[in-house]
């Protein structure tokens, strides 16, 4: 189907259920779907008569009603809302409006959270500069680190699985 045709149908439907006298009740999609369902059911049962048997007639009516309600909700929610959002707004407008609705901040700009500031190091904490080539009198070569035996990580996390 042509995109403009679908968007035109959706805009027409939107204009119909947002008329000023009916604006409060017809903006609720559930009420619109119920009204359309009732109209379709009346027309359906007027045109096509289900079987005469009472039990079969009731079952058929229930199945048809469930199918019609499911189709109407599918049409209303999927086609009307999503196609209007896709064809009447750009993706960026949708994203910006959803962010605006989520935070309700309006036009105020929220500054990004800055990382905690690190205080300046004190003079005695800074390493002293040693001129190249000279060694202080108290200089000692670094001692090798004493290494401990490593324990596998799996045994630390779940020792019961490996002891079996």
From Swiss-Prot:
The keyword Transmembrane helix applies. It is a multi-pass membrane protein. Residues 114-142 are annotated as: Disordered. The chain crosses the membrane at residues 28-48, 60-80. It comes from the Viruses. Glycans are attached at residue 88. The keyword Transmembrane helix applies. It is found in: Host membrane; Virion. One of its GO terms (cellular component) is host cell membrane. Keywords: Glycoprotein, Host membrane, Late protein, Membrane, Transmembrane, Transmembrane helix, Virion. Belongs to the asfivirus B169L family. This is Transmembrane protein B169L. It comes from African swine fever virus (isolate Pig/Kenya/KEN-50/1950). The lineage of its organism: Viruses, Varidnaviria, Bamfordvirae, Nucleocytoviricota, Pokkesviricetes.
């Amino acid at each position: 189907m042509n995109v403009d045709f679908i968007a035109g149908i959706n805009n027409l439907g939107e204009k119909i259920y947002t008329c000023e006298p009916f604006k409060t009740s017809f903006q609720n999609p559930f009420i619109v779907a119920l009204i359309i369902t009732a109209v379709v059911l009346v027309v359906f049962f007027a045109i096509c008569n289900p079987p005469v048997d009472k039990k079969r007639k009731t079952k058929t009516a229930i199945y048809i009603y469930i199918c019609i309600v499911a189709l109407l909700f599918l049409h209303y929610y999927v086609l009307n809302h999503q196609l209007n959002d896709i064809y009447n707004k750009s993706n960026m407008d949708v994203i910006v409006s959803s962010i605006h609705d989520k935070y309700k901040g309006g036009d105020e700009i929220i500054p990004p959270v800055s990382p905690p500031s690190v205080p300046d190091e004190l003079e005695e904490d800074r390493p002293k500069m040693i001129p190249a080539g000279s060694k202080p009198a108290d200089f000692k070569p670094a001692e090798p680190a004493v290494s401990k035996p490593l324990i596998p990580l799996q045994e630390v996390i779940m020792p019961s699985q490996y002891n079996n």
